[in-house]
């Protein structure tokens, strides 16, 4: 039996300027998908997401953290890459989303079409921008036991994910997170500030919940046609109601548990469709042994996506069937 193929979609913190640049220039399917969604977004917010992503005055290292651009940009990149793989005959047996990546997973699985999902993302960005104070997220490369060992240091933050045994993420007010970062660096503990302007998955975005819930009540969602394994629950979802699309960015992320669930069912192959390859890196830490042979990413900040795309042919099997 073939190893089931899992498409993974990451969320806020994985984005950067010029992501997917090679594909946008060289791949017709990717570019067409990006431009179609860009036109939809421009009608809603009055400006081009694509022009912001590929702004000639921006460097990859510049923070791409304006939610009105970054929220839709992540979805557009991930869904457009899915269309490229679909065009090559590479289809998923499962989709796995993490945080904002749950929206792309839902679109790919047929819960909603891409245009409607993009509308949900844009509305969420607008409401959060109008309702919430700014915040930050910090990735820490150490054991989560650190939180218990130094309770005073982490008192003004919220644990939002444990991605593997020595990698966890916290959210909080910007001043508090920056102070934690300084203290960790003094202790020679590696950490990285994520390129976000809001403290996703924490109580700091609660002021946006009511307005977004009201918006979601006008939407309808279908049963997934491809199994969804969610980082919200750490398991397989069979039905997605409107509350899911708020909880996906508010509740803690359980990506580690989602991977463990999949691996308890099958020996899987994984393709990271996010812009940074972050989820692929996590999988390689979570799965012992041959994980490097079972997991790959395509788009990375090193702009080798055309080369990486060719290697993904290894994941295509003629026997795999795909139905909607």
UniProtKB/Swiss-Prot annotation:
Main location: cytoplasm
Enzyme Commission numbers on file: 2.3.1.-
UniProt-listed SUPFAM superfamilies: FabD/lysophospholipase-like, Probable ACP-binding domain of malonyl-CoA ACP transacylase
Compartmental location: Cytoplasm
Keyword terms of this UniProt record: Acyltransferase, Antibiotic biosynthesis, Cytoplasm, Transferase
Active site positions, chain numbering: 99
Entry-linked InterPro entries: Ac_transferase_dom_sf, Acyl_transferase_dom, Acyl_Trfase/lysoPLipase, Malonyl_transacylase_ACP-bd, Polyketide_Synthase
Biological process, per Gene Ontology: antibiotic biosynthetic process
Pfam families in UniProt: Acyl_transf_1
GO cellular component, one term: cytoplasm
Protein origin, superkingdom: Bacteria
Pathway assignment: Antibiotic biosynthesis; bacillaene biosynthesis
MF annotations from Gene Ontology: acyltransferase activity
Root EC class: transferase
Summary of the function given for this chain in its UniProt record: Probably involved in some intermediate steps for the synthesis of the antibiotic polyketide bacillaene which is involved in secondary metabolism.
Protein name in the entry: Polyketide biosynthesis acyltransferase homolog PksD
Source organism (scientific name): Bacillus subtilis (strain 168)
């Amino acid at each position: 039996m073939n190893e089931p193929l899992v498409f993974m979609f990451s969320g806020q913190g994985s984005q950067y300027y010029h992501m997917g640049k090679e594909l946008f220039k060289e791949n017709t399917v990717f570019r067409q998908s990006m431009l179609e969604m860009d036109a939809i977004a421009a009608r809603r917010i009055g400006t081009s997401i694509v022009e912001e992503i590929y702004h000639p005055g921006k460097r990859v290292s510049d923070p791409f953290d304006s939610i009105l651009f970054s929220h839709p940009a992540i979805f557009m990149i991930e869904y457009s890459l899915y269309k490229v793989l679909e065009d090559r005959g590479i289809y998923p047996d499962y989709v796995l989303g993490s945080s904002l990546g749950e929206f792309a997973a839902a679109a790919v699985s047929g819960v909603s079409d891409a245009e409607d999902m993009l509308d949900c993302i844009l509305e969420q960005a607008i409401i959060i921008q109008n309702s919430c104070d700014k915040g930050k997220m910090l990735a820490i490369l150490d054991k989560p036991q650190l939180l218990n060992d130094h309770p005073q240091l982490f008192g003004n933050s919220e644990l939002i994910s444990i991605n593997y045994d020595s990698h966890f993420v916290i959210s909080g007010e910007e001043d508090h997170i920056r102070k934690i970062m300084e203290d960790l660096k003094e202790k020679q503990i590696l950490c990285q500030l994520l390129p976000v302007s809001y403290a996703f998955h924490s109580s700091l975005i609660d002021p946006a919940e009511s307005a977004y819930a009201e918006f979601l009540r006008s939407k309808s969602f279908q049963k997934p046609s491809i199994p969804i394994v969610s980082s919200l629950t750490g398991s397989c979802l069979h039905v997605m109601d409107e509350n899911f699309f708020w909880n996906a960015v508010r509740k803690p992320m359980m990506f580690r548990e989602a991977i463990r669930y999949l691996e308890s069912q099958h020996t899987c192959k994984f393709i990271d469709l996010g812009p940074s390859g972050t989820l692929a890196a996590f999988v390689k830490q979570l799965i012992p042994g041959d994980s490097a042979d079972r997991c790959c990413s395509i788009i990375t900040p090193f702009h080798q996506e055309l080369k990486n795309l060719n290697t993904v042919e290894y994941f295509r099997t003629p026997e795999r069937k795909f139905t909607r």
